């Protein structure tokens, strides 16, 4: 039961991190209007790529944990 509770907590924290990354991505896109040099654009492009990669990784972790929670719940109910 404790393992299930930990998985649920980690799943919720993962969803919160995904939301924070989406907010960060929006803020970075809003600053794209203030770019003055090519270096600024390259830094912004790399930052956006990193946030998108982090979102993909966190979504994969979320799906794995969600599957684990469902599996554990089915085992407990049987």
Swiss-Prot record:
Name the InterPro entries for this protein: Corona_7
User: Where does the record locate the signal sequence feature?
Assistant: 1-23
List the subcellular locations.
Answer: Host membrane
**Any one cellular component term from GO for this entry?**
membrane
- The domain of life for this entry's organism is Viruses
Looking at the keywords, is tRNA-binding present? no
Extract the Pfam families matched here: Corona_7
Q: List the keywords (alphabetical).
A: Host membrane, Membrane, Signal, Transmembrane, Transmembrane helix
Residues crossing the lipid bilayer are 56-76
Classify the protein's membrane topology as the record does. Answer: Single-pass membrane protein
Q: Which family does it belong to?
A: Belongs to the coronaviruses ns7/ns7a protein family.
- What is this protein's function? May function in the formation of membrane-bound replication complexes or in the assembly of the virus.
- The molecule here is called Non-structural protein 7
Q: Tell me what organism the protein belongs to.
A: Porcine respiratory coronavirus (strain 86/137004 / isolate British)
């Amino acid at each position: 039961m404790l393992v299930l509770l930990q998985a649920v907590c980690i799943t919720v924290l993962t969803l919160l991190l995904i939301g924070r990354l989406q907010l960060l991505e929006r803020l970075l896109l809003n600053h794209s209007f203030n770019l003055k040099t090519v270096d600024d654009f390259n830094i912004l492009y790399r930052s956006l790529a990193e946030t998108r990669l982090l979102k993909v990784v966190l979504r994969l972790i979320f799906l794995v944990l969600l599957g684990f929670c469902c599996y554990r719940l089915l085992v407990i109910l049987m």
